[in-house]
Amino acid sequence: MNFLYFIHQRTMVAVKIFPCEEFASWKNESQIFTDANLKHCSILRFLSAEERHSGLQKEYWLITAYHSQGNLKDYLSRNILSWRDLQKMAGSLVSGVTHLHSDYTAGGSPKIPIAHRDIKSTNVLIKNHQECVLCDFGIALRLDPSLSVGDFANSGQVGTARYMAPEVLESRVNLEDLESFKQMDVYSMALVLWEIASRCDAIGGKVKNYEPPFGSKVREQPCMEVMRDVVLYGRERPEIPTNWLAHQGMHFLCDTITECWDHDPEARLTAHCVAERFNLMEQTDSWLFNHVWVVKYTNISLCMEEK
């Protein structure tokens, strides 16, 4: 797969080029993007999908908005974040996942929920104001209730091993419950939130160099067998150092992350619940940090009611 960047109608655009053998991925991503209900400020803006000829070879183009800051992983490798930067990045990421998972658009129109199935920091792009947009929907799945268990089973076991939830690594996903696919996304989202938190200067002291989740435990591209040992059997998660908890906002965020990567899928927060927490933190920042425990337990109660 290749990428091009060029000026189209006086605007820089990005072109994702799929070779013939990746037609299925192009087709799936095109179908996801052409759903008008997908449009959202935290979802990569789609422009067009085209079939092109390069000599005797066919190739398939996906044309989208261009974001010069690149992906989240590279951005975090280059930059240290303020608390405000973290709030914008994490909040916009959560907002995008919430929109994907929702049964309704922000305007109240019904929509089919979508599971991304490959949330990771390289599949998140950075806009100019330190806000995130989700991209790469090549293996995304429409959670259409009219589909059968067999249809979902045929969608295959996909994703990136480092970011796979325990139940995916164990091949024990409950295909009869569409919420299972959302729960897997929430686990992966929690790892990305941890990556963002790890580069925030609100923790005090020296901010460590960027490393991916489980970076000190596994090699650069770990296989599923290795991740099973770490995540499934060892029940390990990325470290949350104690100095992160000295900042009340970070403490609140870390509690949320921990609840999102719970080993039990049913115990994880929904993306909607996480979005509500971020909205509350944004709207009542100073009040929240002075009363974090009261708000925490109140909000957990609300989330449990939602489930």
Regions found by a protein language model. Give the residues of each.
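Glycine-rich ATP phosphate-binding loop
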Residues: 1-19
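The N-lobe alphaC helix and its flanking beta3-alphaC-beta4 segment of protein kinase-like domains
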Residues: 17-48
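Short beta-strand micro-motifs within the conserved protein kinase catalytic domain, predominantly
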Residues: 45-60
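Structural motif in protein kinase domains
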Residues: 67-77
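Catalytic-loop of the protein kinase fold
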Residues: 101-127
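Activation segment/activation loop of eukaryotic-type protein kinase catalytic domains
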Residues: 122-163
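Conserved C-lobe activation region of Hanks-type protein kinase-like domains
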Residues: 169-239
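Regulatory extensions flanking the kinase catalytic core
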Residues: 266-307
